[in-house]
Design a protein with these regions (language model features):
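C-terminal anion-handling pockets and recognition modules
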Residues: 13-14, 146, 155, 159-208
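Acidic/histidine-rich, metal-coordinating catalytic segments
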Residues: 20, 108-123, 152, 160
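Extended, low-complexity cationic-aromatic segments
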Residues: 1-99
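Mobile genetic element proteins and their domesticated derivatives, centered on retroelements
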Residues: 20, 63, 97, 117, ...
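Short catalytic/ligand-binding loop motif for oxyanion handling, primarily in non-cytosolic enzymes
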Residues: 25-28, 121-125, 158-161
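Short, basic/hydrophobic alpha-helical segments
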Residues: 91-113
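RNase H-like polynucleotidyl transferase catalytic core
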Residues: 41-52, 134-164, 177-178
Length: 208
């Protein structure tokens, strides 16, 4: 399916996107390496949480890495991000899928090959039902973007090419000797990935 969707004649209407979620910590320091002077070495200063801090210690984020070009030389230089007030759950997943479909429709796409892992908020009944009903609506109305989910093998997150993007991103947005607010961190992440910073998706009550 991936090879078929990557063919030039399909690229006009098909989108290929690898979806994943990640937590961005305001306090945890990533493992990083850099060239530095022996006279003035660079140190990362670990910050401590304070009770008066109104922001969350970490931000949950949904992301899609879009792929175009042939499968033997894929181009993966575009990302879509959306932060969450809370944690990834099925309700937020469907919201993010809807946002992505709206964006793809504006680009003239009619189908999305969605590649992701087997997280509970991906395989839940709520999400499977939403995708099925969404596709029926697209077929009935003749408008919108169909979603074709393709699951990665279980316990193989490294097969998702978005994973290295997260790792490098965490190294690049770190504040060496200070503490960013949640909004500052989110804005810095969006700037790094060349994405616009949008309002956070909100988790509704009593959903999972």
């Amino acid at each position: 399916m991936l090879t078929w969707a990557s063919q030039e004649r399909q690229a006009q209407t098909w989108a290929i996107g690898f979806l994943d979620e990640v937590w961005w910590s305001r306090f945890a320091l990533p493992r990083a390496h850099t060239w530095q002077s022996t006279d003035d070495p660079l140190h990362l200063v670990e910050q401590a949480w304070q009770k008066a801090d109104p922001d969350a210690k970490a931000l949950a984020c949904y992301g899609v890495l879009w792929q175009r070009g042939p499968t033997d030389a894929p181009i993966r230089d575009q990302m879509s991000l959306r932060f969450v007030d809370g944690r990834p759950v099925s309700d937020i997943t469907t919201q993010f899928l809807d946002v992505c479909c709206t964006t793809l429709q504006a680009q003239g796409k009619t189908a999305w090959l969605l590649i992701w892992d087997n997280a509970s908020w991906h395989v839940s009944k709520r999400v499977r039902t939403w995708i099925r009903e969404h596709n029926v609506q697209v077929k009935t109305s003749g408008k919108g973007v169909r979603i074709l989910p393709l699951f990665l093998p279980k316990q193989s997150p490294w097969l998702n090419p978005i994973e290295p993007k997260w790792i490098h991103g965490k190294r690049c947005v770190i504040e060496p000797n200070g503490l960013l607010t949640a909004k500052q961190l989110a804005q810095r992440i969006c700037a790094y990935f060349h994405c616009s910073y949008e309002a956070h998706l909100t988790i509704q009550e009593n959903v999972s």
